[in-house]
């Protein structure tokens, strides 16, 4: 899962361009995952990456390091919540047709245990809960290398269709 993470996050930029807008969302995500399309800058900054993609389900992997430390010496809760928000959004993106995007309306999360920096690779799995014409909801769980639950959350996303 984490063997070639540096390959996966070596290219940073915007994956959604006029050219990629002709592709289904799942193909864009697969391109980001395999390195043919750039990873979002936030992923490089917080050291997480897409490790699995299928329709309605996305898995991110990430390793919190020194860049994620809060003033008390633990990993800032924002690291977990950012992974949850990213994974939930990408789960929604995985079902979108070409030319259709999304934006997060709300993400709620619960942190269930503290994360220590440099404690290994964490896994954030997101799945769709409901798919409507304009609103998608998804949920995610963040588990540690020990298999324990560290956080969970849900996102409400709005589908953005081209105007005109």
Where are these regions (language model features)?
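Terminal targeting signals and extreme-terminal segments of soluble enzymes
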Residues: 1-164
């Amino acid at each position: 899962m984490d063997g070639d993470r540096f390959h996966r996050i070596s290219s940073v930029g915007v994956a959604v361009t006029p050219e990629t807008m002709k592709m289904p969302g799942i193909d864009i995500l697969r391109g980001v995952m395999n390195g043919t399309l750039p990873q979002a800058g936030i992923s490089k900054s917080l050291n997480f990456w897409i490790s699995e993609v299928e329709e309605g389900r996305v898995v991110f992997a990430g390793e919190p390091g020194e860049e994620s430390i809060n003033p008390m010496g633990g990993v800032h809760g924002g690291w977990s919540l950012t992974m949850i928000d990213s994974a939930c959004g990408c789960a929604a993106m995985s079902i979108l047709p070409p030319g259709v995007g999304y934006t997060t309306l709300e993400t709620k999360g619960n942190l269930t245990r503290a994360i220590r920096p440099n404690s290994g690779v964490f896994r954030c799995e997101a799945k769709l809960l409901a798919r409507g014409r304009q609103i998608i909801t998804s949920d995610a769980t963040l588990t540690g290398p020990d298999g324990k639950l560290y956080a969970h959350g849900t996102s409400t996303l709005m589908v953005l269709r081209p105007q005109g």
